[in-house]
Amino acid sequence: MAPVAFPTSFFLCLLLASGLAQAGRLLVVPMDGSHWFTMQMVVEKLIHRGHEVVVVIPEVSWQLGKSLNCTVKTYSISHTLEDLDREFKYLSYTQWKTPEHSIRSFLTGSARGFFELTFSHCRSLFNDKKLVEYLKQRFFDAVFLDPFDVCGLIVAKYFSLPSVIFARGVFCDYLEEGAQCPSLPSYVPRLFSKYTDTMTFKERVWNHLIYIEEHAFCSYFLRTAVEVASEILQTPVTMTDLFSPVSIWLLRTDFVLEFPRPVMPNMVFIGGINCLQKKSLSKEFEAYVNASGEHGIVVFSLGSMVSEIPEKKAMEIAEALGRIPQTVLWRYTGTRPSNLAKNTILVKWLPQNDLLGHPKTRAFITHSGSHGIYEGICNGVPMVMMPLFGDQMDNAKRMETRGAGVTLNVLEMTADDLENALKTVINNKSYKENIMRLSSLHKDRPIEPLDLAVFWVEYVMRHKGAPHLRPAAHDLTWYQYHSLDVIGFLLAIVLTVVFIVFKCCAYGCRKCFGGKGRVKKSHKSKTH
């Protein structure tokens, strides 16, 4: 009789169930905005699994802490929601006027004011002595944090707790420094570079210059964060000091999107964690889709950041959308373009993932944020990408390189450009085939990204960190890391040996040839 083959899912269930009997205490320090959407999914799953979760947030925020069935602790801050909105709108407005396509222009430009506000939150948190005392007495097992505003890193170091980072990536070189992960500019493209992993000589030169630029300007950009951290911890620290103790890096990407590169054992890839199971559409959106006929629909969203587009650009977009036979569902809260065609429907919100999963969806117009990109990949929808800032240009380049979409410069494009791009991804079958191949690769995995994230958070809670995954490179000096002392020592030995051999040869030559010359010379003098 053949042995019974247990399904893989059975073992995965055992894997995830292993932590149920060891419910722990988790401190969560999140970042506001779209970052919270996916982090919240992990937090809710951990609550469902019986853990005691405490979320610490400022009293003024857009999305944080809403509808959570756990303890939420707030602290007062010096600015209002209007201040936050103003800085964010300025950041958005700037991208439509003077695009910041370099790490220097972005970090020292429109983003600086917004991040100055978020960096100041941590000072307000630690000024609340009752809250700090409460957190100290809870004896948490770990901190689950978003590193974008740095406060979670400071909290973890202050309370000496193991930490789990949840992020798409990290600005500057702090992923490489914090995880001690090699990132050679010869084939690993830097953020904002828009390069692939196959670079020309000129591109490799520029990639190295971007790397140098990061080192030059990131310290200026993060100056306030470092000052706040040093003040709270009562000792001078650097950003590397804050990132180095991290136990696990949960990175919202994978190698379906990213180019292959070295990784470390404490880096876990959970790309597509935001791809939820498709739900049935509401009657309103079902009616829109059904009315589209054989041509289907196009989903258009530039994310939560873009609430309004300059009038001239909005009219160009509306003109292009009116030229295609598909029905366009456009998520937009700005002023309605006067030339909006009948096939274009403006909505303030749309169920993006559910619409992308509908068989009648033909294309996805996106700003190339990682959430939208992965929803496009999961549902196999070719994309027209309009990146504006941050990692969006790099995300778009990666999808374009894989033949799954077309990238447009949203500031320079015309109505003809958008029309042609849409017709290309809809009518050229190769784009649909390529995105379906990426979707198949992405879904072929032994465990869902959400379950994987939950497992590693619980792992750190159970074992009070993951020191066995921490490379010894953290404890080396810069010259030891690059083996400059070893190279210098070996070079000194080689030079010493060469010097000795040279001296021996010179001495031998003098003995062999110098002696004969003197003998001959003395013989001639005697003859005379």
UniProtKB/Swiss-Prot annotation:
Biological process, per Gene Ontology: lipid metabolic process
Function according to Swiss-Prot or TrEMBL: UDP-glucuronosyltransferase (UGT) that catalyzes phase II biotransformation reactions in which lipophilic substrates are conjugated with glucuronic acid to increase the metabolite's water solubility, thereby facilitating excretion into either the urine or bile. Essential for the elimination and detoxification of drugs, xenobiotics and endogenous compounds. Catalyzes the glucuronidation of endogenous estrogen hormones such as estradiol and estrone.
Enzyme Commission no: 2.4.1.17
Source superkingdom: Eukaryota
SUPFAM superfamilies for the chain: UDP-Glycosyltransferase/glycogen phosphorylase
Gene: Ugt1a9
Similarity field: Belongs to the UDP-glycosyltransferase family.
Keyword Phosphoprotein: no
Catalytic EC class: transferase
Keywords assigned: Endoplasmic reticulum, Glycoprotein, Glycosyltransferase, Lipid metabolism, Membrane, Signal, Transferase, Transmembrane, Transmembrane helix
Keyword Transmembrane among UniProt keywords: yes
Species, as recorded: Mus musculus (Mouse)
Subcellular location: Endoplasmic reticulum membrane
Residues with N6-succinyllysine modification: 97
Tissue: Highly expressed in liver and at lower levels in stomach and kidney.
Membrane topology: Single-pass membrane protein
Protein name as catalogued: UDP-glucuronosyltransferase 1A9
Main location: endoplasmic reticulum
Signal peptide: 1-23
Gene Ontology MF terms: glucuronosyltransferase activity
PANTHER family the record matches: EG:EG0003.4 PROTEIN-RELATED, UDP GLUCURONOSYLTRANSFERASE FAMILY 1 MEMBER A1
GO cellular component: endoplasmic reticulum membrane
Quaternary assembly: Homodimer. Homooligomer. Interacts with UGT1A1, UGT1A3, UGT1A4, UGT1A6, UGT1A7, UGT1A8 and UGT1A10 to form heterodimers.
Catalytic activity: glucuronate acceptor + UDP-alpha-D-glucuronate = acceptor beta-D-glucuronoside + UDP + H(+); 2-hydroxy-17beta-estradiol + UDP-alpha-D-glucuronate = 2-hydroxy-17beta-estradiol 3-O-(beta-D-glucuronate) + UDP + H(+); 4-hydroxy-17beta-estradiol + UDP-alpha-D-glucuronate = 17beta-estradiol 4-O-(beta-D-glucuronate) + UDP + H(+); 2-hydroxyestrone + UDP-alpha-D-glucuronate = 2-hydroxyestrone 3-O-(beta-D-glucuronate) + UDP + H(+)
Glycosylation sites: 69, 290, 428
Membrane-spanning residues: 486-506
